[in-house]
Curated annotation (Swiss-Prot):
This is DNA protection during starvation protein. Responsible for protection of cells against peroxide, especially against hydrogen peroxide. Required for survival in host cells. Although it binds iron, it may not contribute to iron storage. The iron-loaded dps has DNA-binding activity. Homododecamer. InterPro entries: DPS_DNA-bd, DPS_DNA-bd_CS, Ferritin-like, Ferritin-like_SF, Ferritin_DPS_dom. The gene is dps. The lineage of its organism: Bacteria, Pseudomonadati, Bacteroidota, Bacteroidia, Bacteroidales. Fe cation 2 binds at E71. Keywords: Cytoplasm, Iron, Metal-binding, Oxidoreductase.
């Protein structure tokens, strides 16, 4: 059986930077996922009902994106990391523990999305240069939903 890169026509040396970018993104997404779970469990205050439900929707959606990123790494000949201890070494997104009010969790989410979206744009650019349209499409799809989410969260947070 041929390796996937032989079948797709992509070159290992060209997609290596894509795999590296996706691996970093995977680490950030995993930390973000963990933070969202904590926000969901620990949110307090008048916005509890709205944000408790919203954060659950967000981490459910994110679980699918994490799987897509890990599978794309495999499709490009890489091996996705699965150890949280390794994610923490390379992730730009940091673990959160004590955020429980609406304002602080919303700020963290929008700050995190800013980091993640910048990485996705960079990955899309590198993937485009490598002729990897599938990864470009994956990143554009993620960005589309995230930009809408940032707009909605910003509108919600505006007093």
């Amino acid at each position: 059986m041929k390796k996937i890169l032989e079948v797709t026509g992509l070159k290992e040396q060209q997609v290596a930077p894509v795999v590296k970018g996706l691996s970093g993104l995977l680490a950030d997404l995993q930390v973000y996922y963990s933070n969202l779970r904590g926000f969901h469990w620990n949110i307090r205050g008048a916005e509890f009902f709205v944000l408790h439900e919203q954060y659950e929707k967000m981490y459910d959606d994110l679980a699918g994106k994490i799987d897509e990123v890990a599978e794309r790494i495999l499709q490009l000949g890489g091996k996705p990391e699965n150890r949280f201890s390794e994610y923490l070494k390379v992730a730009e997104v940091k673990e959160e523990h004590e955020l429980v009010c609406a304002a602080s969790t919303l700020k963290n989410v929008t700050d995190t999305l800013q980091i993640i979206m910048a990485k996705e744009r960079a990955i899309a650019e590198v993937a485009g240069e490598a002729g990897d349209e599938v990864t470009v499409d994956l990143m554009i799809g993620f960005l589309s939903g995230q930009e809408k989410l940032v707009w909605m969260l910003s509108a919600y947070a505006t007093k």
